[in-house]
Amino acid sequence: MSILGIKLFKGESALVTGAASNIGRAIAVRLAGEGADVTITDIDKNRLSEVADEISNISQPPRSIVSDLSNTSGWKNVWNFVADAPPDIFVHSACPQRHEKDLPLSVEEGTFDAMINTNLRSGFFLGREVANAMRNRNVEGRLLYLTSLHATEPRNLPHYSASKAGMTMMVKEFARELGPSGIRVNGIAPGAIPGGGFATSEDSFRPKRKIPMGRFGNADDIARSAMALLSNDFMGYVTGTTLIVDGGLQLFNWIDFPEQ
C-alpha cells in the first residue's frame, strides 16, 4: 500500500477528521498504508466502521470516534479522545454535505452555521489543541487542511466558499506561528472530485472542456498529494501554502462556458 515501497510515517500517529468521506477515507487509508497509527473520526457511524475495517486489512486497527464537528462539544470530544496520545499528523477533511440550492439569498442559517462550525471553527480549535500538544512534545508535526478552489472563486455556495477561504488564511496564520517550532501547516485545494461533498456528473460538467488534463480527479489523487505534503522527507521546507490539485481546472473561469 506504500507509494514508494517505504513506510513514510512509520512510528508516527495521525488524526483524520471526515474520515468516512471520499477524500478523507482515501487519506486515512494511505496514512495507514504508510505506517501511521491512525485515529479516524466522522459523523457517519456506519461508513466510519467500513473505513476502520478497510484500514484493519492493511495495518493495525485504527482508533475511531463518531463526532459531529458542527457543534463545540464535537471537536472537544475528539480532542479528549486523543489527548492521552496526541497525533503527530492532523488532517482536517470534515465538511457537511452542500447543495446547489444553497444560494446567497436562500441558504438557511442553520445550514450556514453547520458549515462554518465544521470547516472553520472546529478546524481551528481542534487544530490548535493538536498544535499545542505537538509543540509541548517538541514534535515536528504537520497540520493539513482540505480547502477548495472556491476559497478564491465563488460558485453560489456562500457558506462553503466563505468557510474554505477562512481555512486558507488559517493555514497561513498557523504556519507563521508554528514554523519556529518545526511544525508545518499546509492545505490542499481539490478540483472536481466525483463522490465528494456534492454530486457532479460528467455530462453536466464536461471535463474535457474545463479540465486541461481531460478527466475528473479521484480521491486517491488527493491522498497521494497529501502524502507528499505531509512527508518531512520530501516537503520538509514547505509550510503555509495551499497545493491546488485539480488537473488545471483553475485555469478556466466559470464564465468561460456561460451556458453551464
In which residue ranges do the predicted regions lie?
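Substrate-binding pocket helix/loop in short-chain dehydrogenase/reductase
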Residues: 100-104, 108-116, 207
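A short, exposed helix-loop element centered on a Lys and neighboring polar residues
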Residues: 127-128, 172
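C-terminal substrate-recognition "lid" of short-chain dehydrogenase/reductases
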Residues: 219-245, 250
